[in-house]
């Protein structure tokens, strides 16, 4: 918050603006925006993507627009190649559940599978994405998102590129601003250490006994 001091790269800075960037629809990649000023007048921006340690999703609402922004003009090819790589696993899935199975309710009918980007392989319908380093950086930073998400609002003020993250913080507990600085990593450094992004396909089921489903969701694989 305003007035908080912290040490960064050998200097002491005082926060002059801080908040969560927001946009009219959807979300930018930055979760924490900080503008700070040093004693000698130098201003810096710190834009952090923040995740809990058990959070595995990177993008969990992947629609056509978002996929193109994150994966580029060949987004369809990336998704098709990814899902085809586990075709046999889709073929082995039940489509109609007369009885409850694991987390799937009795009477469910699978309509298809949603596509999510995650930071670790998880579940049976999951695999590694074939992406360049630039594409991986775009997924984490949001540097290819539209202007209304890149130039987000912080405390009511539109700030250029406030929605594009430069750092990542993965922690369940931070005690102070200095604690945040000590635990955050530059995105390019983090990606050097964690170069892989994975996909996970989650079923969209129609629950016949309740006559309900999870709403209209884009499907990477449909029945």
Name every feature range the model reports, one short phrase each.
Residues 1-223:
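Short, positively charged
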């Amino acid at each position: 918050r305003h007035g908080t001091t912290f040490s960064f790269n050998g200097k002491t800075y005082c926060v002059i603006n801080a908040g969560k960037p927001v946009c009219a629809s959807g979300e930018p990649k930055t979760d924490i925006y900080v503008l700070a000023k040093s004693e000698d007048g130098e201003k810096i921006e710190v834009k952090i993507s923040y995740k809990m340690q058990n959070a595995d999703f990177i993008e969990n609402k992947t629609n056509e627009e978002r996929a193109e922004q994150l994966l580029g003009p060949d987004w369809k090819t990336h998704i098709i190649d990814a899902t085809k790589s586990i075709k046999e696993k889709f073929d082995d899935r039940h489509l109609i559940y007369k009885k409850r199975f694991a987390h799937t309710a009795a009477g469910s009918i699978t309509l298809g599978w949603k596509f999510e980007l995650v930071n670790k392989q998880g579940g049976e319908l999951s695999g590694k994405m074939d992406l360049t380093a630039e594409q991986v950086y775009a997924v984490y930073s949001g540097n290819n998102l539209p202007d209304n998400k890149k130039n987000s609002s912080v405390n009511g003020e539109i700030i250029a590129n406030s929605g594009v993250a430069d750092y990542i913080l993965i922690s369940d507990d931070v005690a102070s601003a200095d604690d945040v600085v000590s635990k955050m990593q530059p995105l390019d450094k983090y990606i050097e250490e964690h170069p892989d992004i994975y996909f996970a396909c989650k079923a969209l089921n129609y629950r016949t006994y309740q006559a309900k489903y999870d709403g209209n969701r884009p499907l990477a694989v449909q029945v």
